[in-house]
Amino acid sequence: MRLAAFVLVAVAFAIIPDGRVSAAALGPPESSEGTHEKARLLRLNAVPQPVETGNQEERTINFASIKKIVPGTSAFKNAQALKASQKAALKAQDAAKRKAAVDKWFKQFESDEFLFTAAFPSWVRKKMHPDKVREYFASLGKSGDDVSMIVKRYDNYRQTIPTKK
């Protein structure tokens, strides 16, 4: 299929620039010198060969100029940018609310009364290791010196409680 199309195009390029489209042009070439094969080869050499300037098949259409002409593309881009900034603002708001809630919850652990009457005894009942307590606070988004101090105090509390035998 491709070969037939290529041959048809090659014949068209050989005949059309010549300007002699007639039955005589399609017939065997007439030459006074040489044989039939030589005349045919001379005629094929006369066909201009295209200059190869790289891989022509991989060229793509550039739509950048069309985007400048079509109305509404810049408005669409602006709307998309606005939506993205609104999403980012909502995420920041949610993160701030979550941080405020965690900070409010963590305030109770600053009180010795809460630690020794509620938190430490419940952790002992659950048989939580100090590392698990640290992981618990980390899962809720708290870490640092305050958490380290609570974990150390819990470890001391756990070691000073008499164990039941």
UniProtKB/Swiss-Prot annotation:
Can you say where in the cell this protein is located?
Secreted; Host cell
Q: Which residues form the signal peptide?
A: 1-23
The UniProt record lists the keyword Secreted: yes
Q: What induces it?
A: Expression is induced during host plant infection.
- Provide a GO CC annotation, any one: extracellular region
Motif placement: RxLR-dEER: 40-59
Question: Per UniProt, which keywords does this protein have?
Answer: Secreted, Signal, Virulence
Of which family is this protein a member? Belongs to the RxLR effector family.
Q: What is known of its domains?
A: The RxLR-dEER motif acts to carry the protein into the host cell cytoplasm through binding to cell surface phosphatidylinositol-3-phosphate.
Record function comment? Effector that is involved in host plant infection. Contributes to virulence during the early infection stage, by inhibiting plant defense responses induced by both PAMP-triggered immunity (PTI) and effector-triggered immunity (ETI).
- Output this protein's name: RxLR effector protein CRE12
State the organism named in the record: Phytophthora infestans (strain T30-4) (Potato late blight agent)
The major lineage groups are: Eukaryota, Sar, Stramenopiles, Oomycota, Peronosporales
Q: Which gene encodes it?
A: CRE12
